[in-house]
Structures are given as structure tokens and as C-alpha cells.
Amino acid sequence: MEHKDPSQMYGTTILCIRRGNQVIIAGDGQVSLGQTVIKNSAKKIKRLANDTVITGFAGATADAFTLFERLESKLEKHPGQLLRACVELAKDWRMDKYLRRLEAMMIVADKSISLIISGNGDVLEPENGIAAIGSGGNYALAAAKALCETNERFSQNMTLEYTITTAMRIASEICIYTNNNIIIEKIED
């Protein structure tokens, strides 16, 4: 099997928005195998570390679960230190011959930080508290940025749930690998 470019993940959309003391991650439910939809209600969002961390994945499902397990192990070694746990995971991802072949990306968030862990082992903190990955990620990101800016400029008082659901719905209308069966997890302080 030829290793694909991890920056070109197909088949899902994961979006994270942070505002004040709240962070929310949403993922669509579609699982595709080639051009065929296999499942419409998959859960690509998961809580870790006694529900203090939420994460979503794009890419190969088995690879993502391997990364969830590794991240959970790092969080046990570094409780309450999400950035450090993610950097340690990224180091392993780059150095380990087996892990380097994994084709997945993750968004990880706790009450204080949101991070993207790329398929290349990069750990990135998004600007403006908004991050997206997957085939519909750019559409969801653009929609979320527009909604957040509109909310801020015109004092619309849009909830995070409304903002993220609307952005995901827009992405699902554009990306054929994303559906509108949206699953949301939230952390608020």
C-alpha cells in the first residue's frame, strides 16, 4: 500500500471553535469507502482524560484509534498538560517507523488550548481559536470564520452550537465526503 500525503485526507470534516471559556468540536458522521457511503452516523469525536479533553479525527479510522490510544497514554503521563502530551505524541509519530505510516490528523482541545496534530507530526495552535481538518475542513473553516466575525462585529449573540452547526452544514453542502449528521462535544469552564 502506497503511503498517501496526510495533508490530503478525504472523507470527513472536523471543526473546532474556541470562544472565551468555551470550546466546541464538531464532526460529521459520514464514512466513505472510495465513492461509496458505508455509514452515515459514525462518531469521530471522542472525550479523553476524564472528559477534560475533546478530540476529533480525519483520515483512516484504525489509524486514528491508534493515535487516540497513544494520546491517552501521553495524557496519563502528563496530566493537565495537553500541549506537552501532544508534542510527545508528535515526537513519537515522527520517530516511530510504524506510526509514520499512519494516515490521520487530529484536532485536540481542553479548557485552555486547541491544537491540530498533522499527519507529518506537526503540532499547531490555530489563530483566532478556529481549526478544521478533513476533506470539508477548508469550507467549514471559512464558514466558521465568517460567522464568528459577523457575530463579533454585529453583536449577534450566536451561540457556539449555532455557529459550529451552521458552518458544518455549509461544508456538508459543498463537500461530497461530508454529511449533515453532526456530532458535537463541548467543554466549558
UniProtKB/Swiss-Prot annotation:
- Please name the catalytic residues of this protein: 12
Which BP terms from GO are recorded? Answer: proteolysis involved in protein catabolic process
Q: Does the keyword S-adenosyl-L-methionine apply?
A: no
Protein's recorded name: ATP-dependent protease subunit HslV
* Inhibition and activation profile: Allosterically activated by HslU binding.
Query: What's one GO MF term for it?
Result: metal ion binding
Q: Which organism is it from?
A: Ehrlichia canis (strain Jake)
Q: Which superkingdom is the protein from?
A: Bacteria
Localization in the cell: Cytoplasm
Q: How does it assemble?
A: A double ring-shaped homohexamer of HslV is capped on each side by a ring-shaped HslU homohexamer. The assembly of the HslU/HslV complex is dependent on binding of ATP.
- EC class, as a word, reads hydrolase
